[in-house]
């Protein structure tokens, strides 16, 4: 007999970010500044997953992610899902998609880039190379970088 038990406590209302690759959960907490809120946040790390082997999960009470946040999530956790919960019931499920452009979040690795000026915010567009790998191209210096270099 298999017993199904939640490994991270259920929330009454809010967002659940599920299927985050293991070790990425803390990065998302700081990226979206979830730790700067008074909202209750529950995080599970290195949980067993049929889909990923191991996963992280984040539950944020009384908070619903913006479309921009959901799409930025795809950069770090392309297989993630965002579940909206109301009265302990699932009312919506979203599968993030990679945005065309991302502003202010990332830092250009090129030390000579104009985006390092205090009056300019960084801006990247996403491209794919011949191997279908995701790259980021800085809008200011126009240099292209592998995803793992910028993230």
UniProtKB/Swiss-Prot annotation:
GO MF terms, alphabetically ordered: metal ion binding
InterPro entries registered for this protein in UniProt: Asp_carbamoyltransf_reg_N (IPR020545), Asp_carbamoylTrfase_reg (IPR002801), Asp_carbamoyltrfase_reg_C (IPR020542), Asp_carbatrfase_reg_C_sf (IPR036792), Asp_carbatrfase_reg_N_sf (IPR036793)
Keyword vocabulary terms for this entry: Metal-binding, Pyrimidine biosynthesis, Zinc
Cofactor: Zn(2+)
GO terms under biological process: 'de novo' pyrimidine nucleobase biosynthetic process; pyrimidine nucleotide biosynthetic process
A single Gene Ontology CC term: aspartate carbamoyltransferase complex
Residue sites binding Zn(2+) per the record: 108, 113, 138, 141
Cofactor note: Binds 1 zinc ion per subunit.
Domain of life: Bacteria
Family: Belongs to the PyrI family.
Subunit-structure text: Contains catalytic and regulatory chains.
Function: Involved in allosteric regulation of aspartate carbamoyltransferase.
Protein name: Aspartate carbamoyltransferase regulatory chain
Species, as recorded: Buchnera aphidicola subsp. Schizaphis graminum (strain Sg)
Gene that this polypeptide is encoded by: pyrI
């Amino acid at each position: 007999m298999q017993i199904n038990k939640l490994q991270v406590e259920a929330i009454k209302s809010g967002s659940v970010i599920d299927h985050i690759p293991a070790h990425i959960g803390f990065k998302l907490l700081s990226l979206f500044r979830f730790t700067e809120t008074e909202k209750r946040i529950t995080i599970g790390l290195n949980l067993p997953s049929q889909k990923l082997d191991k996963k992280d999960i984040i539950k944020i009470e009384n908070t619903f992610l913006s479309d921009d946040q959901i799409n930025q999530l795809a950069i770090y956790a392309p297989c993630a899902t965002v579940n909206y919960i109301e009265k302990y019931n699932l009312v919506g499920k979203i599968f993030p998609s990679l945005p065309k452009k991302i502003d202010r979040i990332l830092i250009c690795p090129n030390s000579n880039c104009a985006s390092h000026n205090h009056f300019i915010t960084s801006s990247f567009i996403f491209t794919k190379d011949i191997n279908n790998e995701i790259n980021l191209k800085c809008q200011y210096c126009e240099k292209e970088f592998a995803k793992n270099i910028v993230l």
